[in-house]
Structures are given as structure tokens and as C-alpha cells.
Regions:
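Short, small-residue-biased leader/transition segments that mark boundaries at the very start
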Residues: 1-2
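Hydrophobic beta-strand segments within beta-rich accessory/binding domains
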Residues: 5-26, 72, 81-86
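Surface-exposed beta-strand/loop patches in noncatalytic accessory domains
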Residues: 21-68, 78, 88-95, 100, ...
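Low-complexity, Pro/Ser/Thr- and charge-rich linker/hinge segments at domain boundaries
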Residues: 102-120
Length: 121
């Protein structure tokens, strides 16, 4: 069973943090999987896919220059982003809360192009 939680990212955001809190109905670790898609769409084979950790993590972060393993760092563009949660325990209900934190800050500076220098003997 897939559940999608869309949220709006305004201009000026440099990091997204997502934490999943599970209630007392949890059967075993890893029965709730997490992933995220950016403003380009929430299709698994589409350009908006930014990461998936399955049930290996209960939280992740995506920033412009760093991200939790399993997720892609890069510019945090404004628009509608989507966290997807999948239950791998059929017929079982679990209380859960999703906390999404958006961090504002200055954009990462782009690296200036490097000039090639030839060494001569």
C-alpha cells in the first residue's frame, strides 16, 4: 500500500529533512518504506526521483551538496514535492507521523570553472 504526502517547497530552501515516527502498532523494523520526489513529478522512473531508502531508515536529509545515502543531493527547487511511504506488512495498520522540516539559507556557490594548465619541461 502506497501513501503519498505532498508538500510545497518555497523559494530559498536549501535542505529538506524528513522523519517518520511510528506508533505502537509497529510489527517489526522496516515495515514502512520511505522515498521522495521533487517538483518534476512523483513517478518512479521519472526525472523527479530523488531517493528511496526502503525500510532501512526512519529519517533522511537532502541538501544542495550533501544527502543521506540512498538520496540525491542537488538544488532544492520550489514547487510541489512528494514523500512516498509504502507499507510492506499487508493487512496491518500502524500509526505514523511524518515530520517534514524545510531549512532556509544561502544557496551553495557554484564551483568556478577550472582552467587547464600545461606543464612544460
Amino acid at each position: 500500500v502506497y501513501k503519498r504526502q505532498s508538500f510545497t517547497v518555497p523559494e530559498g530552501i536549501v535542505k529538506i529533512s524528513v522523519t517518520q515516527h511510528l506508533g505502537s502498532g509497529e510489527a517489526r523494523p522496516g515495515n514502512l518504506d520511505l522515498g521522495i520526489f521533487d517538483e518534476r513529478g512523483a513517478g518512479f522512473e521519472g526525472p523527479g526521483f530523488r531517493g528511496w531508502s526502503g525500510g532501512a531508515r526512519r529519517s533522511f536529509e537532502i541538501g544542495e551538496t550533501e544527502a543521506t545515502p540512498g538520496y540525491l543531493a542537488g538544488r532544492i527547487n520550489p514547487g510541489r514535492w512528494t514523500v512516498i511511504q509504502m507499507s510492506t506488512t499487508a493487512g496491518r495498520t500502524t500509526d505514523w507521523t511524518l515530520k517534514i522540516t524545510l531549512t532556509e539559507g544561502p544557496r551553495a556557490k557554484k564551483n568556478s570553472p577550472r582552467r587547464r594548465t600545461r606543464l612544460r619541461n
